[in-house]
Amino acid sequence: MINVAILSAIRRWHFRDGASIREIARRSGLSRNTVRKYLQSKVVEPQYPARDSVGKLSPFEPKLRQWLSTEHKKTKKLRRNLRSMYRDLVALGFTGSYDRVCAFARQWKDSEQFKAQTSGKGCFIPLRFACGEAFQFDWSEDFARIAGKQVKLQIAQFKLAHSRAFVLRAYYQQKHEMLFDAHWHAFQIFGGIPKRGIYDNMKTAVDSVGRGKERRVNQRFTAMVSHYLFDAQFCNPASGWEKGQIEKNVQDSRQRLWQGAPDFQSLADLNVWLEHRCKALWSELRHPELDQTVQEAFADEQGELMALPNAFDAFVEQTKRVTSTCLVHHEGNRYSVPASYANRAISLRIYADKLVMAAEGQHIAEHPRLFGSGHARRGHTQYDWHHYLSVLQKKPGALRNGAPFAELPPAFKKLQSILLQRPGGDRDMVEILALVLHHDEGAVLSAVELALECGKPSKEHVLNLLGRLTEEPPPKPIPIPKGLRLTLEPQANVNRYDSLRRAHDAA
């Protein structure tokens, strides 16, 4: 077998210098048949036959390849090393060296790295969207410091496909009610609604994925889409390029927003900061295709958005049973309802930031939704002492240690500490608290504060002060029209009775 240099010399001597095959054979030391074969084949680079010899490792290569693939998926602490694999191969009959196993492992690793670098790369068509045509949505996870703690947050991200204007809103959880709330706030910031929304197959919208474009969409999500009058389009599974703008926005936001973000006192403060920061970035960033800023492109697109309707009632409803202690359980926490609904089934409407209890077609209670460090704070009870007044009137002794009454207003607490030292004071205090069922609570508190200022408060004193505070002013005199006025108005003169009496006596 000759090398490239000799083949090049043979071709040059024959085709350029005109040397005969005999002469070329003499110069190169090759046989005339060999020279003739390469000149007739017209190849410029010699082809070497593939090696067909079987190495000692060849029968064991499938097994070793399987072991390497399995161990690669494990954590580093749990992986077997090559020395252990070599011993197992020897036990199976391998007679080669450990170095040969290491060389094969290096080749396998290089091959896997090359596959990882080249996999997923394909050919795509650039997309272009008209003004007001579509927005893209996606969830992401990021961290922020809230009230001095590092908190993991679920970020709802929206981006207008034409202008590239984007909005972010943070939540503690990624649930249906958060998704609905995020849409309303995003549409408010954009000042309108595009014709179409592009989503992946997120669980907060899609219950199950069928063949092709077939989806079983969540009913509440469908209701929201119908309310806001846009069309929801879902991407193919594992096809992030179909909404590449928002996918890139997720990556860019970590650099532009979350790195170097300040500390926040609450989630509400964080969302206010996110809104202002996003709007500021619209003016700073250039549009990737248009010769203008994102803010300028958004100004052109905003006029094509549909006007906002009223907000969608963004709740998810569940049926709950009230306990005998007038509590409803949700996400490990407890919330109070009026005592008249104890041991009954009610409707719990779950919003992004509050819980509303309803029964018999009306709202019966409302509480802020409890959250902790990135997740629902569990094991807490949120009372409203008003809910227990009807029970307290029957059991006044429960006032002393009743958990719902631990957070009464300060004026009530101070009055309670005074009255409970007197005989029958617990019942008097219960009757004072029950006044809020029939009077404005602010007026009752004012009466209690005035009674405390006098130094010796009592139930009668509070009732007297409340009566004065709530007493209606005397009605204003009604003006009499001229047509109803008397020309000679009667006068109240009691002396006329004396004159009549004297006339009677004289008779």
UniProtKB/Swiss-Prot annotation:
Residues 122-302 form the Integrase catalytic domain. This is Transposase for insertion sequences IS1326/IS1353. Coiled coil: none annotated. Residues 19-40 bind DNA. Keywords: DNA recombination, DNA-binding, Plasmid, Transposable element, Transposition. Belongs to the transposase IS21/IS408/IS1162 family. The keyword DNA-binding applies. Required for the transposition of the insertion element. It comes from Pseudomonas aeruginosa.
